[in-house]
């Protein structure tokens, strides 16, 4: 069986690394999106409450009382931060997908080139 040329092995290694980075980005993005949905639900429910409603915030194993406006402000700030992170991850996802496509093309070119040189060697021998 023929040895895989180092150039092709490098391309495959880079492809696998970028693929792993993409999986990591997708996982983090999914986690942020899930947290965003939870925050949006919480905002909707808290906004329905009267101004003097008792609200508790979970901190570790404790429930800490918090006023409605402070809870809303904290949730809105967290939502804004998560939206920013999600947009950043979406850009990273797009760039990584482009890199994967370029690497896939390079790998296919290298494989075609190798296949051609093997067939030439067999036919010329």
UniProtKB/Swiss-Prot annotation:
GO terms for biological process: chaperone-mediated protein complex assembly; protein folding. Disulfide bonds: none annotated. Keywords: Chaperone, Cytoplasm. Belongs to the prefoldin subunit beta family. The gene is pfdB. This is Prefoldin subunit beta. It comes from the Archaea. SUPFAM superfamilies: Prefoldin (SSF46579). It is found in: Cytoplasm. Molecular chaperone capable of stabilizing a range of proteins. Seems to fulfill an ATP-independent, HSP70-like function in archaeal de novo protein folding. The keyword Cell membrane does not apply. GO terms for molecular function: protein-folding chaperone binding; unfolded protein binding. GO terms for cellular component: cytoplasm; prefoldin complex. InterPro entries: PFD_beta-like (IPR002777), PfdB (IPR012713), Prefoldin (IPR009053). Heterohexamer of two alpha and four beta subunits. The lineage of its organism: Archaea, Thermoproteota, Thermoprotei, Thermoproteales, Thermoproteaceae.
